[in-house]
């Protein structure tokens, strides 16, 4: 007997094309296309050494100075050499654009990253002038205690938020710190922000990555507390971190610059005199980038600038830094260069839909439509 043929159900008939979110606003740069070809992909390798406090010419380079503890909240004055700071670097990428007046430009887009803490095996050292388990006997204490691991890859400097345990702490000169911080510094104060623009200047204990910003940066971090916590670190060259967001776009390198940052504290080293200092390790990066065709100055950004100048937000307590707006779902367009502009004006809403602006007179057309409103 011949096998029966299963009939198609109505659920499998006439499948409609998949729909995606209608992206109205997503960052300040509009990606129009991804370039392909033998020279469209490049790889950058770099490493960042830890900035634990001790200078490069010190015998304890890679360590902080001996940790001091204040006896009173109002007398908290850490020394500069006992303050681990973020490591950062700006890597100049090959120049892609000779003419910056075009309506579209090429930009490097970071798509994936391989990174690893280097020197994990050095933590097995238990004999280099450290405190021993028993009096004059036994192995020395290995590096142990709190662990903080962080790295970031971005097309611009990492955005930071100041948040500190003791607002009355007096930081030394030479580090990026507030000398007269308000009480709100012990929680999230939207006014206390900065960008990581200097290597070894931003104390890790006071600055954190800003989750409300960093639209063009990907960051990752873990923390494990304690004084005797054993460090647990993985060694492998097979793990790849994808840097693309939910829209398939990675960090776009503005000005042909790639920004890297890291901080890797693996614990305390306890000396024979019971004094302790922190140990840091370097981090290796391998970044893959591809070329992307982008419009960094779309008309929607210009119109948004005009609107914000006429109707500014006048309250710093509004804890909104960046906004992404989605309006329902739509069919994926056959023309990937189709651009939608939606101009919101008090009491009115105007939608403009036309192909990619390949001629500059279209800028004038949209500006006229805005003026008519």
UniProtKB/Swiss-Prot annotation:
Protein name: Major capsid protein VP1
Quaternary structure annotation from Swiss-Prot or TrEMBL: Homomultimer; disulfide-linked. The virus capsid is composed of 72 icosahedral units, each one composed of five disulfide-linked copies of VP1. Interacts with minor capsid proteins VP2 and VP3.
GO molecular function annotation: structural molecule activity
Biological processes per GO annotation: caveolin-mediated endocytosis of virus by host cell; virion attachment to host cell
Family matches, as InterPro entries: Capsid_VP1_Polyomavir, dsDNA_vir_gr_I_capsid, Polyomavir_VP1_sf
GO cellular component: host cell nucleus; T=7 icosahedral viral capsid
Note: The virus attaches to the surface of cells by recognition of oligosaccharides terminating in alpha(2,3)-linked sialic acid.
Organism this protein belongs to: Murine polyomavirus (strain Kilham)
Pfam families given in the database record: Polyoma_coat
């Amino acid at each position: 007997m011949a096998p029966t043929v299963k009939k198609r159900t109505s659920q499998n008939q006439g499948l409609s094309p998949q729909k995606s979110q209608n992206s109205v606003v997503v960052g300040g740069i509009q990606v129009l296309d991804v370039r392909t070809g033998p020279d469209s992909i490049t790889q950058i390798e770099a490493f960042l050494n830890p900035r634990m406090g001790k200078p490069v010419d010190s015998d304890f380079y890679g360590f902080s100075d001996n940790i001091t503890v204040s006896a009173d909240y109002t007398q908290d004055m850490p020394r500069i050499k006992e303050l681990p700071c973020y490591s950062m670097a700006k890597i100049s990428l090959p120049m892609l654009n000779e003419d910056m007046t075009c309506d579209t430009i090429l930009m490097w887009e970071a798509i994936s990253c391989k990174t690893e803490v280097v020197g994990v095996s050095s933590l097995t050292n238990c004999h280099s002038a450290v405190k021993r388990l028993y009096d004059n006997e036994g192995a020395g204490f290995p590096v142990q205690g709190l662990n903080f691991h962080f790295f970031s890859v971005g097309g611009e400097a990492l955005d930071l938020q100041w948040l500190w345990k003791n607002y009355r702490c007096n930081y030394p000169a030479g580090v990026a710190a507030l000398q007269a911080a308000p009480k709100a510094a012990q929680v999230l104060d939207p006014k206390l922000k900065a960008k990581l623009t200097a290597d070894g200047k931003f104390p890790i204990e006071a600055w954190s990555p800003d989750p409300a910003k960093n639209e063009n940066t990907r960051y990752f971090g873990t923390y494990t507390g304690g004084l005797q916590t054993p460090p647990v670190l993985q060694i492998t060259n097979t793990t790849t971190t994808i840097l693309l967001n939910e829209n398939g776009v990675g960090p776009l390198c503005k000005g042909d610059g790639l920004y890297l940052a890291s901080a890797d504290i693996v614990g305390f080293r306890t000396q024979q005199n019971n004094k302790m200092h922190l140990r840091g390790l370097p981090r290796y990066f391998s970044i893959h980038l591809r070329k992307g065709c982008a419009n960094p100055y779309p008309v929607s950004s210009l119109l948004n600038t005009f609107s914000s100048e006429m109707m500014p937000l006048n309250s710093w307590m509004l804890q909104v830094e960046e906004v992404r707006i989605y309006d329902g779902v739509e069919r994926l367009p056959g023309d990937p260069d189709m651009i939608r502009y939606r101009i919101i004006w008090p009491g009115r809403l105007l939608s403009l839909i036309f192909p990619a602006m390949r001629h500059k007179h279209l800028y004038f057309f949209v500006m006229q439509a805005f003026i008519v409103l």
